[in-house]
Protein backbone atom coordinates (compact mmCIF):
# COMPACT_ATOMS: atom_id res chain seq x y z
CA UNK A 1 0.00 0.00 0.00
CA UNK A 2 1.03 3.60 -0.56
CA UNK A 3 0.07 7.04 0.73
CA UNK A 4 -0.11 9.52 -2.14
CA UNK A 5 0.33 13.22 -1.40
CA UNK A 6 -0.14 15.86 -4.12
CA UNK A 7 1.13 19.43 -4.10
CA UNK A 8 0.27 22.27 -6.49
CA UNK A 9 3.31 24.49 -6.93
CA UNK A 10 2.70 28.16 -5.94
CA UNK A 11 4.23 31.19 -7.65
CA UNK A 12 6.96 31.68 -5.05
CA UNK A 13 8.49 28.33 -6.02
CA UNK A 14 8.44 28.99 -9.77
CA UNK A 15 11.92 28.32 -11.15
CA UNK A 16 13.11 26.54 -8.03
CA UNK A 17 14.29 22.95 -7.67
CA UNK A 18 12.07 20.07 -6.62
CA UNK A 19 14.23 19.45 -3.56
CA UNK A 20 13.74 23.05 -2.42
CA UNK A 21 9.97 22.55 -2.30
CA UNK A 22 9.99 19.08 -0.77
CA UNK A 23 12.49 19.96 1.96
CA UNK A 24 11.53 23.59 2.53
CA UNK A 25 7.76 23.79 2.02
CA UNK A 26 6.50 20.20 2.33
CA UNK A 27 8.99 19.49 5.15
CA UNK A 28 9.87 16.05 3.81
CA UNK A 29 12.70 14.61 5.89
CA UNK A 30 16.05 13.91 4.25
CA UNK A 31 15.68 10.25 5.18
CA UNK A 32 12.26 9.90 3.55
CA UNK A 33 13.39 11.85 0.48
CA UNK A 34 16.31 9.47 0.03
CA UNK A 35 13.89 6.54 0.29
CA UNK A 36 11.47 8.04 -2.25
CA UNK A 37 14.26 8.28 -4.83
CA UNK A 38 14.56 4.50 -4.82
CA UNK A 39 10.82 3.83 -5.20
CA UNK A 40 9.13 3.58 -8.59
CA UNK A 41 6.99 6.71 -8.99
CA UNK A 42 8.18 7.85 -5.59
CA UNK A 43 8.44 11.42 -6.90
CA UNK A 44 6.65 12.58 -10.07
CA UNK A 45 5.90 15.94 -11.66
CA UNK A 46 2.81 16.24 -13.83
CA UNK A 47 2.74 12.45 -14.05
CA UNK A 48 6.37 12.09 -15.15
CA UNK A 49 9.33 10.72 -13.21
CA UNK A 50 11.74 13.51 -12.22
CA UNK A 51 14.94 14.20 -10.33
CA UNK A 52 15.05 16.34 -7.22
CA UNK A 53 17.28 18.85 -9.05
CA UNK A 54 14.69 19.44 -11.78
CA UNK A 55 12.97 22.83 -11.99
CA UNK A 56 9.40 23.58 -10.91
CA UNK A 57 6.90 25.96 -12.48
CA UNK A 58 3.79 27.61 -11.10
CA UNK A 59 0.79 25.27 -11.26
CA UNK A 60 2.83 22.07 -11.62
CA UNK A 61 1.47 19.02 -9.80
CA UNK A 62 4.17 17.44 -7.69
CA UNK A 63 3.32 14.03 -6.26
CA UNK A 64 5.02 11.70 -3.83
CA UNK A 65 4.05 8.10 -3.06
CA UNK A 66 5.11 6.88 0.37
CA UNK A 67 5.28 3.09 0.76
CA UNK A 68 3.22 1.82 3.71
CA UNK A 69 4.35 -1.76 4.38
CA UNK A 70 2.27 -4.06 6.56
CA UNK A 71 3.58 -4.54 10.08
CA UNK A 72 4.17 -7.67 12.10
CA UNK A 73 1.64 -6.84 14.82
CA UNK A 74 -1.10 -9.45 15.12
CA UNK A 75 -4.56 -7.88 14.64
CA UNK A 76 -6.80 -8.42 17.68
CA UNK A 77 -10.45 -7.43 18.04
CA UNK A 78 -10.08 -5.17 21.08
CA UNK A 79 -12.50 -2.23 21.52
CA UNK A 80 -10.83 1.18 21.18
CA UNK A 81 -12.12 4.76 21.29
CA UNK A 82 -11.04 6.45 18.04
CA UNK A 83 -11.34 10.23 18.40
CA UNK A 84 -9.81 11.26 15.05
CA UNK A 85 -8.72 9.51 11.86
CA UNK A 86 -7.61 10.41 8.34
CA UNK A 87 -5.17 9.06 5.74
CA UNK A 88 -2.12 10.22 7.70
CA UNK A 89 -2.85 9.57 11.36
CA UNK A 90 -5.24 8.06 13.84
CA UNK A 91 -5.82 9.22 17.43
CA UNK A 92 -7.23 7.05 20.20
CA UNK A 93 -8.36 7.72 23.76
CA UNK A 94 -6.43 4.84 25.35
CA UNK A 95 -7.80 2.93 28.33
CA UNK A 96 -5.50 2.87 31.38
CA UNK A 97 -5.73 -0.93 31.36
CA UNK A 98 -4.30 -1.23 27.84
CA UNK A 99 -0.57 -1.35 27.12
CA UNK A 100 0.59 0.60 24.06
CA UNK A 101 2.68 -2.08 22.39
CA UNK A 102 3.58 -5.77 22.80
CA UNK A 103 6.09 -6.72 25.50
CA UNK A 104 7.03 -10.01 27.15
CA UNK A 105 4.08 -9.46 29.51
CA UNK A 106 1.60 -8.32 26.86
CA UNK A 107 1.80 -10.09 23.52
CA UNK A 108 -1.66 -9.66 22.03
CA UNK A 109 -3.69 -7.42 24.32
CA UNK A 110 -2.24 -4.02 23.38
CA UNK A 111 -3.23 -0.85 21.60
CA UNK A 112 -0.95 -1.85 18.72
CA UNK A 113 -2.91 -5.09 18.25
CA UNK A 114 -6.23 -3.25 18.45
CA UNK A 115 -5.14 -0.65 15.89
CA UNK A 116 -3.83 -3.37 13.57
CA UNK A 117 -7.31 -4.92 13.60
CA UNK A 118 -9.07 -1.57 13.11
CA UNK A 119 -6.81 -0.50 10.24
CA UNK A 120 -6.94 -3.90 8.54
CA UNK A 121 -10.73 -3.64 8.43
CA UNK A 122 -10.38 -0.25 6.74
CA UNK A 123 -7.82 -1.49 4.23
CA UNK A 124 -5.00 0.56 5.72
CA UNK A 125 -1.45 -0.42 6.69
CA UNK A 126 -0.81 -1.52 10.25
CA UNK A 127 2.75 -0.51 11.14
CA UNK A 128 2.58 0.83 14.71
CA UNK A 129 4.17 4.29 14.80
CA UNK A 130 2.94 5.81 18.05
CA UNK A 131 3.77 9.50 18.45
CA UNK A 132 4.56 9.55 22.16
CA UNK A 133 3.48 6.37 23.90
CA UNK A 134 1.69 6.26 27.23
CA UNK A 135 2.48 3.85 30.06
CA UNK A 136 0.11 1.03 30.80
CA UNK A 137 -1.88 2.57 33.63
CA UNK A 138 -1.94 6.00 31.99
CA UNK A 139 -5.00 6.89 29.94
CA UNK A 140 -5.60 9.41 27.20
CA UNK A 141 -4.64 10.46 23.72
CA UNK A 142 -2.21 8.38 21.69
CA UNK A 143 -1.55 9.44 18.10
CA UNK A 144 -0.40 6.81 15.62
CA UNK A 145 1.21 8.00 12.37
CA UNK A 146 0.10 6.05 9.31
CA UNK A 147 3.22 6.72 7.21
CA UNK A 148 6.88 7.71 7.57
CA UNK A 149 6.20 11.36 6.70
CA UNK A 150 3.66 11.74 9.50
CA UNK A 151 5.90 9.88 11.92
CA UNK A 152 8.74 12.31 11.21
CA UNK A 153 6.70 15.53 11.36
CA UNK A 154 4.11 15.19 14.11
CA UNK A 155 6.54 14.81 17.06
CA UNK A 156 8.25 18.10 16.14
CA UNK A 157 5.09 20.15 16.78
CA UNK A 158 3.16 18.05 19.31
CA UNK A 159 2.28 19.61 22.67
CA UNK A 160 0.55 17.60 25.39
CA UNK A 161 -1.43 18.45 28.49
CA UNK A 162 -2.10 15.92 31.24
CA UNK A 163 -4.51 15.77 34.15
CA UNK A 164 -3.31 14.04 37.30
CA UNK A 165 -4.62 13.44 40.80
CA UNK A 166 -1.74 13.65 43.24
CA UNK A 167 -1.45 13.04 46.97
CA UNK A 168 -1.36 16.14 49.17
CA UNK A 169 -2.11 19.82 48.70
CA UNK A 170 -0.18 21.42 45.85
CA UNK A 171 0.73 25.07 45.36
CA UNK A 172 -1.19 26.98 42.69
CA UNK A 173 1.71 26.68 40.25
CA UNK A 174 4.91 24.70 40.36
CA UNK A 175 7.91 23.37 38.45
CA UNK A 176 9.99 20.29 39.16
CA UNK A 177 13.44 20.41 37.57
CA UNK A 178 15.21 17.19 38.52
CA UNK A 179 17.22 14.77 36.34
CA UNK A 180 15.85 11.25 35.94
CA UNK A 181 17.82 8.03 35.49
CA UNK A 182 17.31 4.26 35.39
CA UNK A 183 18.95 2.63 38.45
CA UNK A 184 18.66 -0.91 37.12
CA UNK A 185 18.77 -1.48 33.33
CA UNK A 186 16.80 -4.70 33.82
CA UNK A 187 13.86 -2.88 35.44
CA UNK A 188 11.47 -0.16 34.27
CA UNK A 189 11.72 1.78 37.54
CA UNK A 190 13.11 5.32 37.25
CA UNK A 191 14.48 7.63 39.92
CA UNK A 192 15.68 11.17 40.46
CA UNK A 193 19.47 11.49 40.48
CA UNK A 194 22.21 13.87 39.35
CA UNK A 195 23.55 11.20 36.98
CA UNK A 196 20.28 11.28 35.05
CA UNK A 197 18.99 13.19 32.03
CA UNK A 198 17.45 16.64 32.38
CA UNK A 199 13.72 16.50 33.13
CA UNK A 200 11.37 19.45 33.71
CA UNK A 201 7.71 19.21 34.71
CA UNK A 202 5.28 22.14 35.16
CA UNK A 203 1.91 22.06 36.86
CA UNK A 204 -1.09 24.22 37.68
CA UNK A 205 -3.52 23.26 40.43
CA UNK A 206 -7.12 23.02 39.27
CA UNK A 207 -8.63 21.92 42.60
CA UNK A 208 -7.62 20.52 45.98
CA UNK A 209 -9.40 19.15 49.04
CA UNK A 210 -6.29 19.33 51.21
CA UNK A 211 -5.54 15.61 50.91
CA UNK A 212 -5.51 15.27 47.14
CA UNK A 213 -5.05 17.72 44.27
CA UNK A 214 -6.15 17.76 40.65
CA UNK A 215 -3.39 19.29 38.56
CA UNK A 216 -2.85 20.20 34.92
CA UNK A 217 0.62 19.11 33.85
CA UNK A 218 2.82 19.93 30.86
CA UNK A 219 6.38 18.90 30.12
CA UNK A 220 9.56 20.42 28.74
CA UNK A 221 11.12 16.98 28.39
CA UNK A 222 9.73 13.51 27.81
CA UNK A 223 11.47 11.05 30.11
CA UNK A 224 9.96 7.65 30.88
CA UNK A 225 7.62 7.89 33.92
CA UNK A 226 8.56 11.58 34.24
CA UNK A 227 5.34 12.89 35.81
CA UNK A 228 5.08 9.92 38.16
CA UNK A 229 8.72 10.11 39.27
CA UNK A 230 8.71 13.88 39.71
CA UNK A 231 5.61 14.10 41.89
CA UNK A 232 6.79 11.14 43.97
CA UNK A 233 10.11 12.95 44.46
CA UNK A 234 8.36 15.87 46.21
CA UNK A 235 6.28 13.58 48.41
CA UNK A 236 3.14 13.81 46.29
CA UNK A 237 2.89 10.54 44.35
CA UNK A 238 0.03 10.07 41.95
CA UNK A 239 -3.05 8.47 43.46
CA UNK A 240 -3.18 4.81 42.45
CA UNK A 241 0.50 4.60 41.48
CA UNK A 242 1.68 1.36 43.06
CA UNK A 243 5.19 1.69 41.59
CA UNK A 244 6.11 5.11 42.97
CA UNK A 245 3.58 5.32 45.80
CA UNK A 246 0.71 3.16 47.03
CA UNK A 247 -2.57 2.05 45.50
CA UNK A 248 -4.67 2.28 48.65
CA UNK A 249 -7.88 2.71 46.64
CA UNK A 250 -7.19 -0.49 44.67
CA UNK A 251 -7.63 1.31 41.35
CA UNK A 252 -5.13 -0.80 39.46
CA UNK A 253 -3.63 2.26 37.74
CA UNK A 254 -2.30 5.75 38.42
CA UNK A 255 -4.70 8.67 37.95
CA UNK A 256 -2.85 10.22 35.02
CA UNK A 257 -4.61 11.16 31.80
CA UNK A 258 -3.34 12.77 28.57
CA UNK A 259 -6.30 15.09 28.05
CA UNK A 260 -5.17 17.33 25.20
CA UNK A 261 -2.73 17.13 22.29
CA UNK A 262 -2.02 19.98 19.88
CA UNK A 263 0.05 19.51 16.72
CA UNK A 264 0.48 20.68 13.14
CA UNK A 265 -1.06 18.29 10.63
CA UNK A 266 1.79 16.72 8.61
CA UNK A 267 0.12 17.31 5.23
CA UNK A 268 -2.38 20.18 5.53
CA UNK A 269 -0.24 22.31 7.84
CA UNK A 270 -3.31 23.03 9.98
CA UNK A 271 -2.83 23.38 13.74
CA UNK A 272 -5.05 20.74 15.32
CA UNK A 273 -6.13 20.24 18.92
CA UNK A 274 -7.58 16.95 20.13
CA UNK A 275 -9.19 16.43 23.53
CA UNK A 276 -10.29 13.27 25.33
CA UNK A 277 -12.39 12.78 28.48
CA UNK A 278 -11.01 11.06 31.57
CA UNK A 279 -11.81 7.37 32.13
CA UNK A 280 -14.90 6.72 34.22
CA UNK A 281 -13.12 5.71 37.43
CA UNK A 282 -10.92 8.80 37.37
CA UNK A 283 -13.90 11.04 36.63
CA UNK A 284 -15.85 9.62 39.58
CA UNK A 285 -12.95 10.27 41.97
CA UNK A 286 -12.46 13.80 40.64
CA UNK A 287 -16.18 14.56 41.03
CA UNK A 288 -16.26 13.08 44.54
CA UNK A 289 -13.16 14.87 45.79
CA UNK A 290 -13.37 18.19 43.99
CA UNK A 291 -16.97 18.55 42.77
CA UNK A 292 -18.23 18.37 39.20
What are the roles of these predicted feature ranges?
Residues 1-292:
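RNA pseudouridine synthases
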